Regions:
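Extreme N-terminal cap/leader segments of soluble proteins
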Residues: 1-60, 88, 106-111, 120, ...
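Short N-terminal helix-initiation segments at or just after the protein's N-terminus
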Residues: 26-33, 78-79, 97-101
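Residues at secondary-structure transition points
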Residues: 29, 59-63, 67, 99
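Glycine-rich anion-binding loops of enzyme active sites
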Residues: 39-42, 49, 84-160
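Basic side chains
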Residues: 45, 67, 79, 145-146
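Small-aliphatic-rich amphipathic alpha-helix that forms the alpha element of a beta-alpha
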Residues: 61-85, 106-114
Length: 160
């Protein structure tokens, strides 16, 4: 079956039994994963972005870098995680201007700073177009799975 016909939820249900441990802090299909260590959950979230798909009108590389970290952090925050750091995986055409890359990373660093966290590393790769992968890690004493229930408070984090 083609992914466009299957859908994300059905795909996640099929992926869940492929090596996902039962004792994980969050259930299969959640937006983040993690491990328990000394009674605290260390959460990890990874998001991938194609620049051309996330750069809204009027956004430059600074805003896209900021948005990448903010989106990744949002998924950790709703799990009751406290973000500690982020890494960036950058895919960059070799003819891209240096200033573009610096602004992209400055935006990501600013978003991390506003969360009391830092950029902690990453990777650069040659790519046919600009893309970024943002991974964030956080601590959570009692992580919340994605299942919202009637009466739960909902918080919106975003720019649109």
């Amino acid at each position: 079956m083609r992914l466009k016909d299957l859908g994300e939820r059905a795909l996640l249900r099929k992926l869940a039994p492929l090596g996902y441990p039962q004792e994980a802090p969050l259930p299969p299909g959640d937006d983040a994963g993690g491990v328990w260590a000394d009674g605290v959950a260390w959460l990890l979230k990874t998001d991938g972005f194609l620049y051309r798909e996330v750069a809204l009108k009027g956004m430059g590389p600074f805003e896209v870098g900021f948005r990448g970290v903010a989106a990744t952090a949002s998924d950790l925050l709703v799990k009751m995680g406290r973000p500690l750091g982020f890494t960036l995986g950058l895919f960059l055409p070799e003819d891209l201007e240096e200033g573009f890359v610096l602004e992209l990373v400055r935006g990501a660093a600013e978003a991390a700073k506003r969360l009391g966290a830092f950029l902690r590393g990453g990777d650069t790769n040659r790519g046919v177009e600009v893309a970024l992968t943002v991974s964030g890690y956080a601590l959570a004493e009692a992580p919340l799975p994605r299942k919202a229930l009637p009466g739960d408070l909902l918080y919106l984090a975003g720019d649109r």
